[in-house]
Amino acid sequence: MADKPYDIVLFGVTGFTGKLACEHLLQKNYPIKWACCARSAGRAKDGLSKIAELAGVGAERLPLVELADLVCSTPEQEAALRAVVAKTKVVITTAGPFEKYGQTLVKMCAEEGVSYADIAGETDFFRSMIAQHDATARRTGALIVPHCGNDCIPWDLSVFEMSELAKRRGAELTEVCTYTEYPPGTGASGGTLTTAIYQLGKQKNKEKTDFDPLLRDAAGSKSEYTTKVTSPKKDVWVGEFQRHGGPWIMSPVMANCVRRSNALLRYSASFVYSEAQLRDTSWAQQAKDFGYTALVGAAIYMPGLFQRFLPQPGEGPSRRTMETGWLVVHGRGKMVDRAKGEETPLSSKFTFGEDVTYLGTARMLVETGMVLLEKRGKAPGGVTTPAAALGSAIVKRLQEQTKATFELSESGAKASVTLRSSL
C-alpha cells in the first residue's frame, strides 16, 4: 500500500469543536502526519495560531493547511477536494450539518478507500450514506463511521461492551436500558440544535430502498438481527435511581445507531433497547427544561422569531464550564444462556469527567481517527458504526487519553421503571 503525505486530515478547524479537536491533536503530539483543511487559508491560519497559544505549543508544531470547499458547485472545486482526500489515510470532520457539508466528502472517501469519521447526529444522513456508499466502501476498504462524538459513542459502545461480555460467557445480550445523567441545565450544542432544526424543518425526501438501510448487514443483505426500541415517550419514574427519566431530542439518533450495530454485530435477533435521560426532580429545574424544550420547538417552526435565542453554530461555553462538565451513561442489560436456561443481569457505567457536547466530542473524534489509522487495511470497509468499526479499542483509548472511565459487571440490579407522568 503506497504511503501518503498525511495520516489524518481534519476538516472544520474554523468551527468551535474543530478548534478543540485541533488543540487535542497538538497537545497529544501523536507521531503522525496530519493537516487541516479549510476554505480560507487566512482564517484557518489565524485560528491555528490562537489554538497553538492555548495548547502551549510553538508555531513550528502547527499543521499544514490544505484548501478545499465541502460544497462543490464546479468541477474545479470537486477536483480540489478529491486531491485533499487522496492525500490522506483518514479524514475526520466536525463540519455540519453533515447532510449539507458531508455528502461529497463521504462519497470521495468511499471511492478513494479513505477512512472517515464525523460527529454527526443525523439519522437521515446516516441512512443515505449507507444506501449510496456502503457497497463502494466495502469494495475499496474504506471505513465510513458517522456518529463518533457524544452522538453516539457513549451509548453505542456501552451496548457493545455488554454484548462482548455476554459472548465471553457463552450467552446472548437480549436487552439493554440506558440511563443518562448530565449536569442540571445542560442543553444541546449550537451545532446539534442547528442540525436538529435543519432536519426537522426540511422537506423529507427519503430514497427508495427495499428495506431500511440501517438493517443492512456486513454483506449488504437485510440482516435478521432487528432491534425493538422501547424508549419512554414521557417522563417515567426510575426506581433504582429515585429520579424521573424521559425522552430527549437525540435519543432516537442513539437508538438508530444501536439498531445498525445490532444488524452488523448480531447481538440478538430480537434485541430490545431503551434510553431515558435522568432528570433533576426539582420543580424549578423541570420548569426550566420544559421552557427550553418549548423554545427549541418554536425555533423549528418559527426560526425567524425564536432561533436567535438558541446557541449558534461555532458558539460554545467557557473553558471552565467545559472542564467542569460531565456525563454518565448507566447501562442495565440482560444476557441469556439459552443452553442453560439462565438469565443474568449486566451493569455498565461510562463516565466522562468533562463536557461532552464540545470538548469530549472533539476528543472522541480525534481518538476515533487514531483507531481508524491503526485499523487501516486490517478491517473490512463499509458505512458502519462506532461499535462495529472501533470496538473495544476506542473505549481503551478514551480511558487512556481522556477523562473517561468504563465499568462493567454481571452483578448490577436492573432498574425498575414505573410509567408515571412527572408534569
Task: Give residue spans per PLM region.
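C-terminal catalytic/substrate-binding lobe primarily of soluble NAD(P)-dependent oxidoreductases
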Residues: 18, 141, 164-423
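Short, conserved SAM-binding/catalytic segment
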Residues: 47-58
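Conserved glycine-rich Rossmann-like NAD(P)H-binding loop of the short-chain dehydrogenase/reductase
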Residues: 30-43
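Conserved Rossmann-fold cofactor-binding substructure of NAD(P)-dependent oxidoreductases
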Residues: 66-88, 94-97
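ADP-ribose/adenylate-binding Rossmann-like module
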Residues: 97, 108-126
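N-terminal Rossmann NAD(P)H-binding glycine-rich loop of SDR-like oxidoreductase domains
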Residues: 8-27
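Structural motif
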Residues: 7, 89-90, 115
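Rossmann-fold NAD(P)-binding glycine/threonine-rich loop
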Residues: 120-142
